[in-house]
Amino acid sequence: MTVFLSFAFLAAILTHIGCSNQRRSPENGGRRYNRIQHGQCAYTFILPEHDGNCRESTTDQYNTNALQRDAPHVEQDFSSQKLQHLEHVMENYTQWLQKIENYIVENMKSEMAQIQQNAVQNHTATMLEIGTSLLSQTAEQTRKLTDVETQVLNQTSRLEIQLLENSLSTYKLEKQLLQQTNEILKIHEKNSLLEHKIFEMEGKHKEELDTLKEEKENLQGLVTRQTYIIQELEKQLNRATTNNSVLQKQQLELMDTVHNLVNLCTKEVLLKGGKKEEEKPFRDCADVYQAGFNKSGIYTIYINNMPEPKKVFCNMDLNGGGWTVIQHREDGSLDFQRGWKEYKMGFGNPSGEYWLGNEFIFAITSQRQYTLRIELLDWEGNRAYSQYDRFHIGNEKQNYRLYLKGHTGTAGKQSSLILHGADFSTKDADNDNCMCKCALMLTGGWWFDACGPSNLNGMFYTAGQNHGKLNGIKWHYFKGPSYSLRSTTMMIRPLDF
């Protein structure tokens, strides 16, 4: 603004200096217009003209108060007047400039205020638009950030849950791993102990094997010697058995002779007394008992369809008496490993071990209905029995098949004899239902069926050697399949006794 005013003042002075060469237009009315352009603003200044010519009156040229010099006096007065005039003009211009400056300042204030107000309004609107846009963008970004934050939180929650689950799984796995490690350590310790024990056992086992080898060699030598002794004993036993059979036959012949002599004496006494009674034969021990003979012993019976009488042992003491003994084992003195013919006709002594004979058993049980009772005794002194209400066997063509009904007794809840019918087998007559030939494997003659749960005609074993013997005297449901009994007795009695 100061530069502008200085420029205006300088222009006014120059204009005044050159006023002598200018003309006033009659239209201007004695005024002069000066227009100044400053930026976008244009300012017009109206300057008043001085009345009269540029020169002062001649009276002023000769003012007595003017300074005088050595130069011509007329020119000095003119210069003084001119300076005074210029000073006066300068004062006027100064006043006008002050007015102009005041006017400009006032106008500039209002214009600047208006400009500032417009600028502020424009800036405010722009700022409002920018602020609105920023608020919208901020809200949108906030919403997006909220969504992202929600997603991040959800993902973080999932990750935290997964992390917790993984932590739990890891903890469980670590716990299981520790347990398994402890178990492995315990197993390792046990294995170490077991290995140590195994080493010790191997050493002991080697020592025992060496001892057993020595004992085996000694036993083999002993077995060889015993085998030779047994063979010699068998030979002697066979010879003794042959001699015993001869003696038994001689004894039977003597008993028959004595019996005949007794009968003859009885007949002679009756004839002498004038009384003659008809002799009544006994069919079995029941008839003997009913005839008044109640003492156990050997009696002669007459069996239907048999050509000769038969000596039998009658048990008159057990369960009412009247029992005909058909089989008895007690001491192993008689060999029961015999053939078909011997089992057919019987063998042994009725007062000891013997077998009555299948043909005689068939003949007796064909006379009437009989009950079978089997008495058993083990090596511990325990007695038991099995009883069958109905008992009979078939003829030789039927292989002396066994028929039984109605089992009772104390020698097992089940029958050790085959109830549905089994054929009799011996070492030379295999009639069983097994491909193994039970009579050869189990010894003796019996109703084996498929080797079955019983064999009372098996090998006799003494005390201490009677265990684990499948071919012994066995009754399965009393003492098991491999226990050999001490004594057995098979006897029959009429059902209606």
From Swiss-Prot:
It is found in: Secreted. Glycans are attached at N92, N122, N154, N243, N294. CDD domains: FReD. GO terms for biological process: angiogenesis; blood coagulation; cell differentiation; Tie signaling pathway. Keywords: Angiogenesis, Coiled coil, Developmental protein, Differentiation, Disulfide bond, Glycoprotein, Secreted, Signal. InterPro entries: FIB_ANG-like, Fibrinogen-like_C, Fibrinogen_a/b/g_C_1, Fibrinogen_a/b/g_C_dom, Fibrinogen_CS. One of its GO terms (molecular function) is receptor tyrosine kinase binding. Residues 153-261 form a coiled coil. Pfam families: ANG-1 (PF25443), Fibrinogen_C (PF00147). Disulfide bonds join C285-C314, C438-C451. One of its GO terms (cellular component) is collagen-containing extracellular matrix. Residues 276-496 form the Fibrinogen C-terminal domain. Residues 1-15 form the signal peptide. Binds and activates TIE2 receptor by inducing its tyrosine phosphorylation. Implicated in endothelial developmental processes later and distinct from that of VEGF. Appears to play a crucial role in mediating reciprocal interactions between the endothelium and surrounding matrix and mesenchyme. Mediates blood vessel maturation/stability. It may play an important role in the heart early development. Homooligomer. Interacts with TEK/TIE2. Interacts with SVEP1/polydom. Interacts with THBD; this interaction significantly inhibits the generation of activated PC and TAFIa/CPB2 by the thrombin/thrombomodulin complex. PANTHER family: FIBRINOGEN ALPHA CHAIN. This is Angiopoietin-1. It comes from Bos taurus (Bovine). The gene is ANGPT1.
